[in-house]
Structure formats: structure tokens, C-alpha cells
Amino acid sequence: MTLRAAVFDLDGVLALPAVFGVLGRTEEALALPRGLLNDAFQKGGPEGATTRLMKGEITLSQWIPLMEENCRKCSETAKVCLPKNFSIKEIFDKAISARKINRPMLQAALMLRKKGFTTAILTNTWLDDRAERDGLAQLMCELKMHFDFLIESCQVGMVKPEPQIYKFLLDTLKASPSEVVFLDDIGANLKPARDLGMVTILVQDTDTALKELEKVTGIQLLNTPAPLPTSCNPSDMSHGYVTVKPRVRLHFVELGSGPAVCLCHGFPESWYSWRYQIPALAQAGYRVLAMDMKGYGESSAPPEIEEYCMEVLCKEMVTFLDKLGLSQAVFIGHDWGGMLVWYMALFYPERVRAVASLNTPFIPANPNMSPLESIKANPVFDYQLYFQEPGVAEAELEQNLSRTFKSLFRASDESVLSMHKVCEAGGLFVNSPEEPSLSRMVTEEEIQFYVQQFKKSGFRGPLNWYRNMERNWKWACKSLGRKILIPALMVTAEKDFVLVPQMSQHMEDWIPHLKRGHIEDCGHWTQMDKPTEVNQILIKWLDSDARNPPVVSKM
């Protein structure tokens, strides 16, 4: 029968070095008889302290003194003396903190899941009630999102190698034994699975195990391109709504804990445009709030043009923070979201912990030239003139939403729409294919998410962001001479042919603490086009410049 499920042990397989490998390493370091600590670990067999720990009958802090006593008894039997400073707690604290995700093994699991395999973790583990328990929580939180099932011995009251846990596994997978491959680093844990008819792989080193896994599955797992970062499934996310004024609410998706980071998308997009950044930033230790900007998705979309001027939008973002009890947040924007976050830094610097923009530069207002004059002088912005008349662009963009998003969401090395002479041509899509090919950046399922979102909101609200040029200019002129002094990041994309990198060349004159990132071979849709590079740049900057300062009570 064909394999269709892959099961991975945690300790020694998905996470290295194995925690319980510390027993042998400690024996060697302290010149103790070989096997002494392992004997103490297994003392009592099915009724012993370790089995009770793994079944969740006692916690790790309860187990530690029992293990200390077992070590003392075993050392007396062996007629050896343990060092005076011998501490099982210290030994296991260090071993647990040293354990990291085995990335090649995780990548193999991701590849198998992508190819249609059901994946699971089957682990003997414990209830961790130590002061240092957050490390295990972080490890499990990151791993869980990549697997269909997680079976923890301490939660189900069964342990490997007891036969019943393997039957429980098969019931959970809804699979027959011959459809399952199981990887573990302990031979005794593999035997019952093999006796049932599962394919088993003993993991002694990762490369050898993956070669064997390749062989039994027929799927290439080694020397493959690095996978895309973890994405978001909209139905699995936590969705929130904040009413910022009567009849206007903002929708957001939230993940993670730590300093707040507000992600602000551009036109014509969605919170979902940050789908590759949300898990990465959350895993890096931030509370991510990915916005549906006003006019989009599940946020309110009032029809009035003035509802979308920057002054109103920024005031509403401040109210959003107020309603969530956030004194400050990091603001990261792209496209129009980038424009908004620069305005937040200018007019509400006390509420902005740090600010970053992808593609959109900060350019101070020119009091001697209105923005419409500037746009008319630059042919690449001709499409923005086409967007000015209410109803015209809406009709074209809403006519066939699938065509709209497939035409717009293109990588820089694919055929892209020209933004020149849009008014003269009478539309964005004139002479473009009725059925555009799908970009390598997106899947059909992702395109359909945008289609469904814009069926709800339409394009009037999103286009109204373009129809406040004069209002935004007059407001911006109030900040003439003002500098942005908070931590800031500008990320340019080499092949964005509208927001070209050269537009950002004088930003240091106005933002003295500006840091920069640059992504080569990247077009306008930066988060989708180069998600790995975006994540690396953002996390490095956040960790160095955007961690919250200590909170001092004013009570």
C-alpha cells in the first residue's frame, strides 16, 4: 500500500541535540560508569518516575527530586560518588535550553505535507512547570503549525514504546499501518510500530535518515530549494474588530505576543498580503496586528472621499491603538500603507515605537507645487490621474476580479502592466489579456481570496485613497521642516518601476536615524515576491531598533 502519512519523533529527530542524550554526555564529563544515569532514568520501569512523568501523572519539577534520588541510589549500588554540586535540574535545564529545531528535518516534513502527506509529531514529553518553561512552549508553538497532528505522551496518558500509543496514532491518522512511515531516534520505540506494519526509520544522523525517507516515499527531500516561509490560512487566524468611530470599524488579524507591530498594506490588497510575514514576526517575539486598511476586506468602506484622507486615517489608527490599550506600536507599511506609516511618524511620533516602509519613500511636501502637478509631470504616475474620477476605474477593476488580480500581481521578471498613458488608453487593462496567466508569486487559491474580499468591499474605498491628494498635501505642509527622529527603516525593491529606489535617495536628510534594506530582483509586490528576504530584513531591524523600552507606571 502507498505511504500517505509521515510521523516524526520530537527529541532527537525534529529537535537537536536530544535532551536525554545529556545522560551519556554527563557520564562522560563526570567520569561516571557508563549507563549509570540511564539506569536511574529508567528505574522503576512502567511504574517508575520517568514513565509517570511522560504520562503526565507528575510534572517536571516533581520528577527532578525523584530522579535525583534514583541517581543517588544507583551511584551507591555502583559504589561511586556523585560530585557535590551534582544537579539533575541544572543538567536538564541546560539540555532543554540547548535544543533547537532541526531545520532540514522540518523542511522534509513540510515538503511531504506539500505533496499531500498527512504529518504528525509523536513524542514522549512532559508537563513543564519550571520557571524556564517558556522555551518548550516556544518550540512546540512553532512546530505545531507545520503538522496536522501533535500527540504528546503527557497529554494522552500513553508512552512509547507501549503498543496502545501506536494504535492511538493510527486512529488519529485514520490510516492503516502500511500507509505510515515513522521516524524515531530510539530503536525500542520503532519496534512496536514495525511489528504493526509501519515503515520505520532509525534516526542516528539527519542526512542518512532523510536519504532513507526519500527512498521510501519517492519524494526528493535533500538538495531542494529553500521553501517559502510559513504562510497563513485565513480560517485558522484570530480575527479582531475595533470600532474607531460610529459606523467605521477596522478589521485585523492577530498572532504572537510581545511588542506590537501593525502591518499596513497597500493598493489593492489585504491583510493577507502579509501572509508570509505574520508567522515569522510572531515567532520572532512580536505581537503582529495585520490590518485590513479602511475600505478593504472586512473593514468598513464608507463611500465619502474625505473619509480616506491621511489626517482622518491616522486619527483612526490612533483610536485603534487606544481601543487596544496600546501606548505605542511599530508601524510597517507597503505602498499606500507606507505613506500612512510615515504620516504616523510625523504627526503622532509618541505613538510610534519605530517605523518601516517597503518601497514607499518619505518625501516631504513641497509647498510650492501641488501633488497633482507633480503627478502630471511624471508619466509613470499617469494611472493615478485615471483613478481620480469616481466610478471610472471602479467599473474596470470590478468587472472581472480574477483578471484584475492576475493582471496586477506579477513578479518583475513576468509581463507587467504599463502604468504609462493609462488615461490616453482609457484604462489599465486595455490591450492586456482577458485571461492572464497566473504569476509564480501566487496560487489560484490565493487569488480567489482577494476576489472574495473585493466582492465584499468593492474598489470605491481603495480608490478613494488616491482622491485626497490636495487634502493630504495641505495637511503635510503643516509639518514643513519637521524631521522623523524615531527608529526608522526604508526597504527598497530593485525592480519596482513605479516606486523606484532612487526616490528614497535624500531620506537621511529628514530621517537622521534611518536604516536601509534593499532587495534585488524584486518588483512592487515585495512581501509576496521576496518573502524570505523581507522577513530577514524586518526581524533584524526589529530586534535591534524596535524592542519596547521598559514600561514605567504613571500611577
From Swiss-Prot:
A lipid is attached at C522 (S-(15-deoxy-Delta12,14-prostaglandin J2-9-yl)cysteine). One of its GO terms (cellular component) is cytosol. It is found in: Cytoplasm; Peroxisome. The modification Phosphoserine is found at S370. The N-terminus is blocked. The covalent modification of cysteine by 15-deoxy-Delta12,14-prostaglandin-J2 is autocatalytic and reversible. It may occur as an alternative to other cysteine modifications, such as S-nitrosylation and S-palmitoylation. The keyword Lipoprotein applies. Belongs to the AB hydrolase superfamily. Epoxide hydrolase family. This is Bifunctional epoxide hydrolase 2. It comes from Homo sapiens. The gene is EPHX2.
